[in-house]
Amino acid sequence: MTYSLRIADLPSNERPRERLIACGSQSLSTAELIAILLGTGQGKGKLSAVGLGQYILNQLSQYERDPLSILRNITVQELTQIHGIGTAKATTILAAIELGKRVFQSRPPELAVVESPQAAADALSQDLMWQTQEKFAVLLLDVKNRLLGTQVITIGTATETLAHPREIFGEVIRQGASRVIISHNHPSGNVEPSPEDINLTKQLLAGAQILDIPLLDHIIIGNGEHSSLRQITNLWEDYPQRG
């Protein structure tokens, strides 16, 4: 794709809107998605909307970070410092980013059945995803694995003990839940469990056996990713849970 051509001058199979309709939004590059938001480029003889989208990403790459991670929290003032981006284009980009955040963070309806690690991560994303502080939360379920609610138990840092079994199961009992999924976030984005994560999970699985409140999983959430300790460890074989 030539970035200096107007989008109208491109072959139809290279135009972002037409490609989105024909192939789906996931097939577009980040620059093409931005181009759809921009609508127009810098003007005659200059960058097209796609070229301007790529130029924005290139400018943000100068900070030696993923451009998308910078876009997530960018301001109108920062965007309008980029040549070719005025207030109208900047506010359109920010509105799209905020809408994407809200869609991503939306919780499933109450009493939705949580049947997979992905469903659990979706339910907890508003509390734990993209957070700069480490948080520990519980997903409260009834006997049929229907979602009763979520609760952040503690907020701390990676060097602190985030949660004690007494706090976790105390909340489960207070809320009248029959089953529980625990979760915490890694602000670094790395969702591999640490030795401390493994040890805490062992303690909680043992406590769940004593209290007869099945602990179904421990989900670690990062920047758009998650991992299930039930899937990647043998802990549930060592500490089997009822049901």
Swiss-Prot record:
InterPro entries: MPN, RadC_JAB, UPF0758, UPF0758_CS, UPF0758_N. Keywords: Hydrolase, Metal-binding, Metalloprotease, Protease, Zinc. Residues 113-235 form the MPN domain. Gene3D superfamilies: Cytidine Deaminase, domain 2 (3.40.140.10). Zn(2+) binds at residues 184, 186, 197. Belongs to the UPF0758 family. This is UPF0758 protein Tery_2667. It comes from Trichodesmium erythraeum (strain IMS101).
